[in-house]
């Protein structure tokens, strides 16, 4: 859902709101605000983790393996509507941010920093990212672009302008 680039590294965040469950069949079920249930085989932790690896591969392709080897890339899940997420061996508690961590922006930032510290401290060779490298990563991930309306949209706009002009001319 989100990518945060900070001095201590990059943090890939999966946000899951509403009611969440994993059944005996291993499938995850998400009930949205409209009470519609969505079923997925990949849970939020797997989504965040696979997002991390996809991002890491994209950054290596963009900046090179040597440039990225000392950069900490972590992942976590935010559950803004839920407290006391069940713990499992496959997920570290530092990667989970729940509703009590989201009460205020300060608490959320503290929880994100705690998660980033967890990932940053996993390897002795991780180095902080300087502001220029952060800027380059930001531009590499979010390049400047321009989107223009399709021809059919422009034709409809022009047609509506002509109708408007014709109506005004008729009244003159």
Where are these regions (language model features)?
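Surface-exposed interaction regions that form or flank ligand-binding interfaces
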Residues: 5-11, 19-21, 25, 33-171
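N-terminal low-complexity, intrinsically disordered segments
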Residues: 1-3
């Amino acid at each position: 859902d989100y990518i945060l680039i900070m001095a201590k590294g990059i943090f890939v965040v999966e946000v899951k709101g509403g009611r969440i469950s994993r059944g005996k069949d291993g499938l995850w079920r998400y009930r949205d605000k409209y009470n519609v249930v969505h079923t997925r085989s990949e849970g939020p932790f797997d989504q965040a983790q696979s997002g991390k690896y996809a991002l890491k591969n994209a950054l290596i392709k963009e900046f090179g393996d040597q440039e990225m080897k000392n950069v900490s890339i972590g992942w976590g899940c935010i559950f803004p509507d839920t407290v006391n997420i069940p713990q499992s061996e496959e997920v570290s508690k530092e990667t989970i941010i729940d509703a009590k961590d989201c009460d205020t922006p300060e608490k959320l930032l503290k929880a994100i920093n705690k998660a980033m510290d967890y990932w940053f401290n996993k390897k002795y060779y991780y180095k902080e990212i300087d502001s220029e490298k952060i800027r380059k990563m930001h531009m590499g991930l979010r390049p400047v672009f321009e989107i223009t309306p399709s021809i059919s949209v422009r034709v409809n706009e022009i047609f509506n302008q002509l109708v408007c002009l014709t109506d005004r001319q008729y009244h003159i």
